């Protein structure tokens, strides 16, 4: 997958290219990323990229010309099929379903705003989609862009050691992930559930599914409203609810 990022702070993206899962993906050639700084496309000695908004109001806006030219440069490198995404609080909220949709793209150009945002004409003429990572305020689009890159790259074939790693992540099937344990078997009076030590793969599968369903019910019940549960899932969830009532 090819990713282009338009940002005033390209150095921030070393966190993506140099570390962790995404860093390994870059080193293996599974993920390619380039950055474009709008300041490099200015025509004045001060490299001005922002100006006051028409109509007044607080803060500054990113100007059209430097940002537009940076986007054009990124698109030229990406090819005609590239989708231009602006990270914005007004955008579609990023979910695992959205991540899976974006992962089908061979190339993406991510535009990171700063200050009070960008001139609306950039969105009208250059942006294909707007995406948001949540209903809260950040200082710029860089952190949302890195979040999107990390989540999408996990679905690129070969990035994770095992396909099952991505399939078992929270939200991959619409549910939260189940609890996980590693050594030691006992710590401070807390023991690993016996079923995980049993070696019975079917029992382990059902336990994990039940825990995933139960955790979703307790922590994010709204997620269950959008799911059509199978007969097995309904049974496991009912058993989980009964066990909670008995322990109460």
UniProtKB/Swiss-Prot annotation:
Signal peptide: none annotated. It is found in: Cytoplasm. The keyword Transferase applies. InterPro entries: Alpha/beta_knot_MTases, tRNA_m1G_MeTrfase_C_sf, tRNA_m1G_MeTrfase_TrmD, tRNA_m1G_MTases_N, tRNA_MeTrfase_TRMD/TRM10. S-adenosyl-L-methionine binds at residues 113, 133-138. CDD domains: TrmD-like. Its EC number is 2.1.1.228. One of its GO terms (cellular component) is cytosol. Its main location: cytoplasm. SUPFAM superfamilies: alpha/beta knot. Homodimer. Specifically methylates guanosine-37 in various tRNAs. Belongs to the RNA methyltransferase TrmD family. This is tRNA (guanine-N(1)-)-methyltransferase. It comes from Shewanella piezotolerans (strain WP3 / JCM 13877). The lineage of its organism: Bacteria, Pseudomonadati, Pseudomonadota, Gammaproteobacteria, Alteromonadales.
